Swiss-Prot record:
The VWFA domain (or beta I domain) contains three cation-binding sites: the ligand-associated metal ion-binding site (LIMBS or SyMBS), the metal ion-dependent adhesion site (MIDAS), and the adjacent MIDAS site (ADMIDAS). This domain is also part of the ligand-binding site. InterPro entries: EGF_extracell (IPR013111), I-EGF_1 (IPR040622), Integrin_beta_N (IPR033760), Integrin_bsu (IPR015812), Integrin_bsu_cyt_dom (IPR014836), Integrin_bsu_tail (IPR012896), Integrin_bsu_tail_dom_sf (IPR036349), Integrin_bsu_VWA (IPR002369). The chain crosses the membrane at residues 710-730. This is Integrin beta-6. Integrin alpha-V:beta-6 (ITGAV:ITGB6) is a receptor for fibronectin and cytotactin. It recognizes the sequence R-G-D in its ligands. ITGAV:ITGB6 acts as a receptor for fibrillin-1 (FBN1) and mediates R-G-D-dependent cell adhesion to FBN1. Integrin alpha-V:beta-6 (ITGAV:ITGB6) mediates R-G-D-dependent release of transforming growth factor beta-1 (TGF-beta-1) from regulatory Latency-associated peptide (LAP), thereby playing a key role in TGF-beta-1 activation. The lineage of its organism: Eukaryota, Metazoa, Chordata, Craniata, Vertebrata. One of its GO terms (cellular component) is focal adhesion. Residues 22-709 are extracellular. It comes from Bos taurus.
Length: 788
């Protein structure tokens, strides 16, 4: 049962040659060469497994080798292997001794990789409770930070009190920085070298690069005392030399006092940007930063004016290497710059610092809690040429591909990571890589070595009798011949080593470049695409032309580079059918009589003809209508000469056959309207000579002649009726008008009013007239008195 399951496993591994690119390509003559072709390939070391000189057949997929008869025990198919060397369980709860804390599992393993095969490992990380914390406070002491210095004079006590709630083992240290003490970053007059603030006037310390002032200690009062004694300094340009200070604080492990089993926090406090990389070339400093500790006996950075500022890449390497987590506490104006830095530096966070550093305590506590809520893996070591991919399984339990970071974790939660490793090719060297959580001292060490050799290579029969009386060494089922011999069993000597007999013509490659010349005969290579054959391996069954991506259009067989078409197909690609069925139009005529059938498609020859069967042709004559003159002549009863009808039919390209006995397999049914409005029907067929013959001429549905008397009577009656109707209408209109006038008169008469006492026509007999010259007596008197 176990053997059957193992066989099934190999069958699953053995994929199709055409899909994977093939194994038996004829180029693998040894087991090791076979394994290098691809992870799908295996080697059969069984003796006498292949035909004479068919060494390439030993290299194939496991399934194909089993099918060829190779026993399972002789199949060389190494797979990737994982050996866990150290796997201590993760720590749970508080640990009395920090050296006993285990935060990653496993701790070391050996990985053997078959090139092209992936191997997945599971790594678990759990942050332990009450983990020791080392905090180094790195402060910018340029003149603009004077008020901040006064604010943090009691920071040590307050910070220790707050951190005691999170860990019982807390230490803190202090360092400061300003700028490289060299022009153009500082003024160089003697007065300003001694006191950079002399122009204010105010006393401040000479410009310095970095000073390590207080090693890490649990004495908070000592921290407060050191801070109270600090003095500010000054420089010219706005960017400071903070990255110099970060580098020294990270790499000077002994001087700073970083512990191996603790969380290393570096709090960087500044209100300005920092120089980095080649900025120091402004001062003529061109020696790159070496990333080493250069603190002198006074704990000052001694190479400040000699080495360049570190680059971002150098900072990342040293911070990760020394497990230092960086907390940028910067003012609002600088937050955007340092957020960009933090995106590049693993484990770095950014907090907004108030103008006087009044919120520094809360900023540090918040940053610490944020760092403890995240678990991120970092890869170190020799990873060149190694393919690594990560899948994170955080507290939700849902796998997240291409992610090596878990956020919103609680202390004590376990974060799992599936790490998939693969080698693209076989490199004859082992490599050492490290997977570690950012900021933690724990790490997983992995020794990666390639698995490119076969177990059968360990058993070698030197000068074996299996190789023609000792003419070679027997290994992995084949003979490795001594110089001057060749062949499957080293049976060919120097006299048969000539390849001229294996060449099709002088100057041509041996066996056409597709086979091996063994003892004067070609043994063709095996190909995943088909068979190679011929005395010179000059033929194959897969190099013919393709039609629509298919060899010989899938309608023929390829023989020595030429398509041999199956029945019903022709053409160079076997893409041309000999059937004319697709070319027959609905009327049963090939290409509607307007084209030729080529490869099952109509090629229209008549101008204007189109369509799959040339059925559309606006400019072509109607085959039915073109026979009109012939048909009408045949049906005419006016005594036209029969010879004249024959001539008209000849002009129309047709003859009339009155016999009813004709083939009705294919015909065209026509219908025309004649001059006398009759419907004429007839059939068109083609005789053996291809000429048109007219059959079954019928005339039907002829209209009857008109009845003239009835038409005249109807017209007369219609005229009479119209006259009567018009008279009636006139009479109605006149009557309506008269009635309207009478009504109007009656209305006016009813409105008239006459006086009843006097006849308006009567005149009296007496008339009275007035003399206009007569004046009354009194009026004359008045007029006279007025004049006087």
């Amino acid at each position: 049962m176990g053997i059957e399951l193992l066989c099934l496993f190999f069958l699953c591994l053995g994929r199709n040659d055409h899909v994977q690119g093939g194994c038996a390509v004829g180029g693998a003559e040894t087991c090791e060469d076979c394994l290098l072709i691809g992870p799908q390939c295996a080697w059969c070391s069984q003796e006498n497994f292949t035909h004479l000189s068919g060494v390439g057949e030993r290299c194939d997929t496991p399934a194909n080798l089993l099918a060829k008869g190779c026993q399972l025990t002789f199949i060389e198919n190494p797979v990737s292997q994982v050996e866990i060397l150290t796997n201590k369980p993760l720590s749970i709860g508080r640990q009395k001794n920090s050296s006993d804390i285990v935060q990653i599992s496993p701790q070391s393993l050996a990985l053997k990789l078959r090139p092209g095969l992936e191997q997945t490992l599971q790594v678990q990380v759990r942050q332990t409770e009450d983990y020791p914390v080392d905090l180094y406070y790195l402060m910018d002491l340029s003149a603009s930070m004077d008020d901040d210095l006064n604010t943090i004079k009691e920071l040590g006590s307050l910070l220790s009190k707050e951190m005691s709630k999170l860990t019982s083992n807390f230490r803190l240290g202090f360092g400061s920085f300003v700028e490289k003490p060299i022009s153009p970053f500082m003024k160089t007059t003697p007065e300003e070298i001694a006191n950079p603030c002399s122009s204010i006037p105010y006393f401040c310390l000479p410009t310095f690069g970095f000073k390590h002032i207080l090693p890490l200690t649990n004495d908070a009062e000592r921290f407060n005392e050191i801070v109270k004694n600090q003095k500010i300094s000054a420089n010219i340009d706005t960017p400071e030399g903070g990255f110099d200070a970060i580098m020294q604080a990270a790499v000077c492990k002994e001087k700073i006092g970083w512990r191996n089993d603790s969380l290393h926090l570096l709090v960087f406090v500044s209100d300005a940007d920092s120089h980095f990389g080649m900025d120091s070339k402004l001062a003529g400093i061109v020696i790159p930063n070496d990333g080493l500790c250069h603190l002198d006996s006074k704990n000052e950075y001694s190479m400040s004016t000699i080495l360049e500022y570190p680059t971002i890449g150098q900072l990342i390497d040293k911070l990760v290497q020394n497990n230092v987590l960086l907390i940028f506490a910067v003012t609002q104006e600088q937050v955007h710059l340092y957020e960009n830095y933090a995106k590049l530096i693993p484990g770095a966070t950014v907090g907004v610092l108030q103008k006087d550093s009044g919120n520094i305590l809360q900023l540090i506590i918040s940053a610490y809690e944020e760092l403890r809520s995240e678990v991120e893996l970092e890869v170190l070591g020799d990873t060149e040429g190694l393919n690594l991919s990560f899948t994170a399984i955080c507290n939700t339990g849902i796998p997240v591909p291409h992610q090596k970071k878990c956020s919103h974790m609680k202390v004590g939660d376990t974060a799992s990571f599936n790490v998939t490793v693969s080698l693209p090719n076989c490199e004859r060297r082992s490599r050492h890589i490290i997977l570690k959580p950012v900021g933690l001292g724990d790490a997983l060490e992995i020794l990666v070595s390639p698995e490119c050799s076969c177990d059968c290579q360990k058993e070698v029969e030197v000068n074996s009798s299996k190789c023609n009386n000792g003419n070679g060494s027997f290994q992995c089922g084949v003979c490795a011949c001594h110089p001057g011999h060749m062949g499957h069993h080293c049976e060919c000597g120097e006299d048969t080593l000539s390849t001229e007999s294996c060449k099709e013509a002088p100057g041509r490659p041996s066996c056409s470049g597709r086979g091996d010349c063994y003892c004067g005969q070609c043994v063709c290579h095996l190909s995943p695409y088909g068979n190679i054959y011929g005395p010179y391996c000059q033929c194959d069954n897969f190099s013919c032309v393709r039609h629509k991506g298919l060899l010989c259009g899938d309608n023929g067989d390829c023989d020595c580079g030429e398509c041999v078409c199956r029945s019903g197909w022709t053409g160079e690609y076997c893409n041309c059918t000999t059937s004319t069925d697709p070319c027959v139009s609905e009327d049963g005529i090939l290409c509607s009589g307007r084209g030729d059938c080529v490869c099952g498609k109509c090629i229209c020859t008549n101008p204007g003809a189109s369509g799959p069967t040339c059925e559309r042709c606006p400019t072509c004559g109607d085959p039915c209508n073109s026979k009109r003159s012939c048909i009408e002549c045949y049906l005419s009863a006016d005594g036209q000469a029969q010879e004249e009808c024959v001539d008209k039919c000849k002009l129309a390209g047709a003859t009339i056959n009155e016999e009813e006995d004709f083939s009705k397999d294919s015909f065209v049914s026509c219908s025309l309207q004649g001059e006398n409005e009759c419907l004429i029907t007839f059939l068109l067929t083609t005789d053996n000579e291809g000429k048109t013959v007219i059959h079954s001429i019928n005339e039907k549905d002829c209209p009857k002649p008109p009845n003239i008397p009835m038409i005249m009577l109807g017209v007369s009656l219609a005229i009479l009726l119209i006259g009567v109707v018009l008279l009636c209408i006139w009479k109605l209109l006149v009557s309506f008008h008269d009635r309207k006038e009478v009504a109007k008169f009656e209305a006016e008469r009813s409105k008239a009013k006459w006086q009843t006492g006097t006849n308006p026509l009567y005149r009296g007999s007496t008339s009275t007239f007035k003399n206009v010259t007569y004046k009354h007596k009194e009026k004359q008197k008045v007029d006279l008195s007025t004049d006087g």
